[in-house]
């Protein structure tokens, strides 16, 4: 019985997916401990909330634990995993622990290759504005709240559903969003795209008969699976056939303005405090959910207009000085797949028309670089200046002709932009300072250690 579990230990507690669950469990009154290879702002926050944090992994770290939570990034050879098995302590996958939390609430789960974090944040923000006090677990820090997780007293738990390891199939939400489906994390699915699409069908089919699948029909792969889903469906998009759709969409002062048409309801004029057509789609998904659960139109409009974004999702670091006496704009973004990168580049062009766009990119995983190589070359060639660094391996072994140098050579051969290759991420900030010009927009992108570059530039260049 659940009351027998009092102490829960997280291996890799500093990761964004693990830390959010740990914070909610702390707020539920559980004793929480965790280990990670290095301290960061996340582990420091959890320690202040009462978690016992260990630096490094050791068998002694799990002393007293009633359950041990792991992610797919944690190897079976991890000494804490080995010790837990020896002591017969239950080892719980991260997604299964999230599923247990979801059983305590009505779950709203957001799935899709791109846009999960922003969409989850938008849903949580609207429900919060509507007075529904949701619990949420997000894959990025909600800027307005200063955290990626919160225990609310309301009926709903809003969370990302991770398809990368197929663990979203543990979840049993009452509302499921699918933003899009692209070929990513294909190792999980035996490099079979049909298996990946079937997993999304299975995810939606886990809904109860009274649930709702909220699907973006602008995405061709989502449209393809739609006939296979037998649960109630609400569609959204720019497509005229969408039940929740955006019309009269325009870019104004770094924001998106549009009108939302909903079947049987009054039109809704919306200002979204984020740039990009992809973010309009994210907002439509959130509006569809909010409408379904009874949030007022006033709450929807206010939350979207005041939405301050999510950490590392088109996160603006303001203006910074250049060597020629001018200033450049600095933006940081988590995007690391060619499709989401193209959407973010388009958003940057829309937000800063006429400016030179400098992209600083660290590829994430050799397998993704290999599988999407030509698409990467195409999207990287759409910038005005390009700084490339070596692939962040995320535990993978190098793959021949799928490293940063190979990508730089291919972009150079394409002939549209001359890449600057920087081997070490620690040297990227200095390279950017040397090449940046007045009025440039510098967009730092990637899911690995590149995340340290924008803060380093922002801190160094601060007045």
UniProtKB/Swiss-Prot annotation:
Its EC number is 6.3.2.8. This is UDP-N-acetylmuramate--L-alanine ligase. Its main location: cytoplasm. GO terms for molecular function: ATP binding; UDP-N-acetylmuramate-L-alanine ligase activity. It comes from Thiobacillus denitrificans (strain ATCC 25259 / T1). It is found in: Cytoplasm. InterPro entries: Mur-like_cat_sf, Mur_ligase_C, Mur_ligase_C_dom_sf, Mur_ligase_cen, Mur_ligase_N, MurCDEF_pg_biosynth, UDP-N-AcMur_Ala_ligase_MurC. One of its GO terms (cellular component) is cytoplasm. It catalyses: UDP-N-acetyl-alpha-D-muramate + L-alanine + ATP = UDP-N-acetyl-alpha-D-muramoyl-L-alanine + ADP + phosphate + H(+). The lineage of its organism: Bacteria, Pseudomonadati, Pseudomonadota, Betaproteobacteria, Nitrosomonadales. Belongs to the MurCDEF family.
